[in-house]
Amino acid sequence: MKDSREKLIKRFLCAKTNTKIVNQENKLYYFFLHEDLYPIIFQNTDSSFGKFSSVFRKTNIKKNHRESFLTIKSCIFLFRSNNFSGRKRSFFSNTRFHDQKKKENFLPLPKKVIFSLFFESITFILLCNQKKSDFEKQFFQTKDLSISIQKPLASLERQWQYDSFGFQGCFSYFFHPEVVLRILRKKFQDISFLHLLRKFLHLNVYLSNNTVKEVPTNNIRTILWNIYFLEIDSFFVSICKNYCISDEINNVSSNYSLSCFEKIQEWTYFVEKQEYKDFFEKKLYPYEIFDTITIRNSEERRLEQSIKRQISFLDQSKIYKYFRTNTNWFIFFQKQKPENILLKRWIILFFIRRLGYILQENTINWTLTFSEYQNELSAYFFLAYILQFPKKKNFVKINTKLFFLVHYFVRRVISFLNPLYLIILLLSKQNFCNSFGYPKSKSGWVTWTDTDIIQNFTRLQNNLFFFYSGCTNTKALARIHYILHFSCVKTLACKHKTNLRYIYKKFGTNLTRKDFTTKIFVTNQSKNFRLRSLWKNQKMTRVWNFRLTQLNSLIFHLETFYRLR
């Protein structure tokens, strides 16, 4: 093996070429000669995988005939050459591989092929060692009924009064390549592989849009995104594991908290971790609440019932909630104030030392639910809703024989507001109205038929109404209905080149107002409620839609408008 390896090195290092090493990219060639790197790239036999053989045996990898030993060695040769280009090269004409070269189809951009192969190996090693539990299989079978965008908001409204404080923060989209290497250092022990990956990341191969489109595999930026945010989510889950579980419960059973939080890590991301395509194509946006009580087994519940008398109600309900959409995150706890300051410093040190951020204490905000120091006007944007914690005064008048007793009870109320200004900006960008909210015709839909135009407007209107069915300011939905209704009428008038009166005579005044009722699930899942339409009863009931799973694009567009505001 050593003799063959030395001959292979001499064959490519001592090749008779008149070129000189000029670019920094040519230094990448020497990293390919490591023994552990070949089994990652060349997927020939199980024996050649080395220490990664157990990983590749578990996954049924479809062999791509365009990615072979010979093609990658040709890529290495092109790195060493001076005239590096994307066109096909025939440099094996005087070698014994000339006959095999005719059967192979060399890729036009070999550097990008190698770059994609490295990220494939990263995802295999990160994801393939994890097994599904019975709880996770049962969870994904009922995925359509249980997963919803509005489910975290509904549970937050139901349980937020038990939370004494919380944290809210936001982190940037951009990160340094060394941060990714620092994260991958936990899984990889191959130093040459990490150095080669560092070279690729510092060359910014993946940044330009033109290079990403020509890569044969899926988008590489989503892989870097997922690796980065998986590290952040695992940190917050580990904080809650060490911070929320009471000491008396841990004394009863040592594995009590570990068994609970292992299920949380499997249940976190709403993307099956063993599916290889989802990690490339989709970004991981968790919309679920991590609750230490609802995920316990039957045995753990028996232990909890046995110590109910010894633990108070607040210690027993050590519920924490962690939310994250895109870059915004929330954590709600039940602890005292001195411990909150330590937790805030812990989070800041993680962002500074682990992720290389330059943060101050003001970057992580307090979201105190029961505190007189909280500002009533403070609002937080989350899941395309505006969260506020205003004070509500209840007036109580007690009538006695002699005089009246008047009392005021002040309590905190959580409110979910509809960001009407951001929705108007989004509709104006799509040419449904101007920036002030005055509707106008959609000129791009003039070539469609009348039924297609009406159906698309009603579909857009119903999606917005279903998404904001849980907001407290339902009057803002009337403004959205006004914009979409008159925009539909103006597009039909522009198509037929008539006035609005003719359109109302032809189609009627209830153009986009169709009577419909749909069954949805609210907080009490044992009962079915019907969502009453705005135009049927002139009032919309405030309910949570637990079947709303496909409006991620609306959330991300509104978040971009909120950041640019």
UniProtKB/Swiss-Prot annotation:
Keyword RNA-binding appears in the UniProt entry: yes
Alphabetical keyword list: Chloroplast, mRNA processing, Plastid, RNA-binding, tRNA processing
UniProt GO MF annotations: RNA binding
Keyword Chloroplast assigned: yes
InterPro entries found in the cross-reference section: Domain_X, Maturase_MatK
Cellular component GO terms held in the UniProt record: chloroplast
Localisation: Plastid, Chloroplast
GO BP: mRNA processing; RNA splicing; tRNA processing
Pfam families: Intron_maturas2
Entry similarity comment: Belongs to the intron maturase 2 family. MatK subfamily.
Matching HAMAP family: MatK
Role this protein plays: Usually encoded in the trnK tRNA gene intron. Probably assists in splicing its own and other chloroplast group II introns.
Protein name (database record): Maturase K
Record organism: Staurastrum punctulatum
